[in-house]
Amino acid sequence: MTSNSDGSSTSPVEKPITGDVETNEPTKPIRRLSTPSPEQDQEGDFDEEDDDDKFSVSTSTPTPTITKTKDSSDTSTVTRRKQPIRYIENKTRRHVTFSKRRHGIMKKAYELSVLTGANILLLILANSGLVYTFTTPKLEPVVREDEGKSLIRACINASDTPDATDTSPAQEQSPAN
């Protein structure tokens, strides 16, 4: 604040900061991640002139590959490229990925039950032996009661290959004509 010769005070006018503070040059517009529209080329042209990637900082977790494409109006868009699904060797990274994906699949199960009214029972068995569950209220007794718990234990402890008694023709039912 400054005071005038008549004793009144004035406050400086605040201007919004635009551009680089030190050089006062305008900054580049922010690019947002987006998926290409069906009309755009899915392969995309790589922007050779953009050198923003040379200042990137490496992180402990790998980020998805980002492809820069140009559309007909010369504005560049950034799209994500799908990473191949393979076993994660790093134990810490594997645990973090498991936790995030477990949370994501439970969120999807909840959304599916709310949107469609479906009854859902989701069991996730971790390598550590812990069982994570998501149930809608109607199926909750399957997880909470002793009979349901014993059924879940039997399924978890069962072998991966079907028994010979399970595939006998006498137990198979054919549709009535």
Curated annotation (Swiss-Prot):
What Gene Ontology terms for biological process does this UniProt record contain?
arginine metabolic process; positive regulation of transcription by RNA polymerase II; regulation of arginine biosynthetic process; regulation of arginine catabolic process; regulation of arginine metabolic process
Q: Does the keyword RNA-binding apply?
A: no
What Gene Ontology cellular-component terms does the record carry?
Answer: nucleus; RNA polymerase II transcription regulator complex
Q: Which SUPFAM superfamilies does the UniProt record give?
A: SRF-like
Q: Where is the composition biased (Acidic residues)?
A: 40-53
Give the UniProt subcellular location, in the record's own words.
Nucleus
Q: Where is the composition biased (Polar residues)?
A: 1-12, 158-177
Keyword line: Arginine metabolism, DNA-binding, Nucleus, Transcription, Transcription regulation
Instruction: List the molecular function annotations (GO) for this entry.
Output: cis-regulatory region sequence-specific DNA binding; DNA-binding transcription factor activity, RNA polymerase II-specific; protein dimerization activity; RNA polymerase II cis-regulatory region sequence-specific DNA binding
Chief location:
nucleus
Q: Which residues form the MADS-box domain?
A: 80-134
Compositional bias (Low complexity): 56-67
Residues covered by region (Disordered) = 1-82, 157-177
What InterPro entries is this protein classified in? MADS-box/MEF2_TF, SRF-like_MADS-box, TF_MADSbox, TF_MADSbox_sf
Subunit relationships = Interacts with ARG81 and ARG82.
Q: Function, please? A: With ARG81, ARG82 and MCM1, coordinates the expression of arginine anabolic and catabolic genes in response to arginine.
**This protein's name:** Arginine metabolism regulation protein I
Native source species: Saccharomyces cerevisiae (strain ATCC 204508 / S288c)
Recall the taxonomic lineage recorded for the source organism.
Eukaryota, Fungi, Dikarya, Ascomycota, Saccharomycotina
